[in-house]
């Protein structure tokens, strides 16, 4: 079981909770989502509480994250979109910290669960829909009628735009889930090769050198992927928010 690359994604009930036949158990996924929030909040608190004129390295990282989200949101949705900054920044930090924590031994990668990433994606699209109708009313539906489209093909274009819009939660969630899942499976497979070959003795240890090098390389790549997936998730979120702020553009 220890060498099973899928075992690391198993969901375990830590505190069984059943309410009216609905399973609301506190699981390992729940625990590590809480841990992600605590770590992200603690990091931001520690890095933003300093009063020194010269920022520390960690404070610089925190400021870079702030500037990245602020710039992405401003470039995508303009100044009117900045009201969503706390929401987008919270999403970015949650996904980023969750991805990074999952790379450490004995930590669970919560973003490798499709239900978690889908919930985040639905939260984004739900926010877009609610704000769009709240701010623009039926004018939000202009989003599905691009300007300059000949009247004869408007029904076809509207149908395509609606399908494209409704598929956003799926593409947004699957992209994050699939990348984290595939990367961790690959890493586990190569790490398993190292352990299995090393257990064979001197000859096996010699054969474990290449898988060990690959494991180190994949680990480094996974850190890059962890950041890139948080980056992509945030940029797409900013683009979707622009649809709520400026549906006719």
Swiss-Prot record:
Domain of life the protein comes from: Bacteria
Coiled-coil residue windows: none
Keyword Cell inner membrane: yes
UniProt entry tagged with the keyword Lipoprotein: no
Disulfide bonds: none
GO cellular component: plasma membrane; proton-transporting ATP synthase complex
Keywords: ATP synthesis, Cell inner membrane, Cell membrane, CF(0), Hydrogen ion transport, Ion transport, Membrane, Transmembrane, Transmembrane helix, Transport
Topology in membrane: Multi-pass membrane protein
TM helices/strands, residue ranges: 26-46, 84-104, 114-134, 143-163, 193-213, 216-236
GO molecular function, one term: proton-transporting ATP synthase activity, rotational mechanism
Location(s) in or outside the cell: Cell inner membrane
Pfam family, one: ATP-synt_A
Family recorded in the similarity comment: Belongs to the ATPase A chain family.
Family annotation (NCBIfam families): ATP_synt_6_or_A, PRK05815.2-4
Protein purpose: Key component of the proton channel; it plays a direct role in the translocation of protons across the membrane.
Subunit note: F-type ATPases have 2 components, CF(1) - the catalytic core - and CF(0) - the membrane proton channel. CF(1) has five subunits: alpha(3), beta(3), gamma(1), delta(1), epsilon(1). CF(0) has three main subunits: a(1), b(2) and c(9-12). The alpha and beta chains form an alternating ring which encloses part of the gamma chain. CF(1) is attached to CF(0) by a central stalk formed by the gamma and epsilon chains, while a peripheral stalk is formed by the delta and b chains.
UniProt name for this protein: ATP synthase subunit a 1
Organism: Brucella anthropi (strain ATCC 49188 / DSM 6882 / CCUG 24695 / JCM 21032 / LMG 3331 / NBRC 15819 / NCTC 12168 / Alc 37) (Ochrobactrum anthropi)
């Amino acid at each position: 079981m220890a060498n099973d690359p899928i075992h690391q994604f198993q969901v375990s009930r830590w505190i069984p909770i059943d309410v009216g036949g609905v399973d609301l158990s506190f699981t390992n996924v729940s625990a590590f989502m809480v841990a992600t929030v605590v770590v992200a909040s603690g990091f931001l608190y520690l890095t933003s509480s300093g009063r020194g004129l010269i920022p520390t390295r960690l404070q610089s990282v925190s400021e870079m994250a702030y500037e990245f989200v602020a710039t992405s949101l401003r470039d995508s949705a303009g100044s009117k979109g900045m009201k969503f900054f706390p929401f987008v920044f919270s999403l970015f930090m949650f996904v980023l910290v969750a991805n990074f924590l999952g790379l450490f031994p004995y930590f669970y990668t919560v973003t490798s669960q499709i239900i978690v990433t889908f919930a985040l994606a639905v939260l984004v699209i739900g926010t877009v829909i609610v704000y769009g109708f709240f701010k623009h009313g039926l004018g939000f539906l202009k989003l599905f009628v691009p300007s300059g489209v000949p009247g004869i093909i408007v029904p076809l274009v509207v149908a395509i735009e609606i399908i494209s819009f409704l598929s956003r939660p799926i593409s947004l969630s699957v992209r994050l889930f699939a990348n984290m899942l595939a990367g961790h499976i690959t890493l586990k497979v190569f790490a398993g090769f190292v352990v299995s070959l090393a257990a064979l003795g001197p000859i096996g240890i010699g054969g474990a050198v290449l898988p060990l090098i690959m494991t180190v390389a994949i680990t480094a790549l996974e850190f890059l992927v962890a950041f890139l997936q948080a980056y992509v998730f945030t940029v797409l979120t900013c683009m979707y928010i622009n649809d709520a702020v400026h549906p006719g553009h």
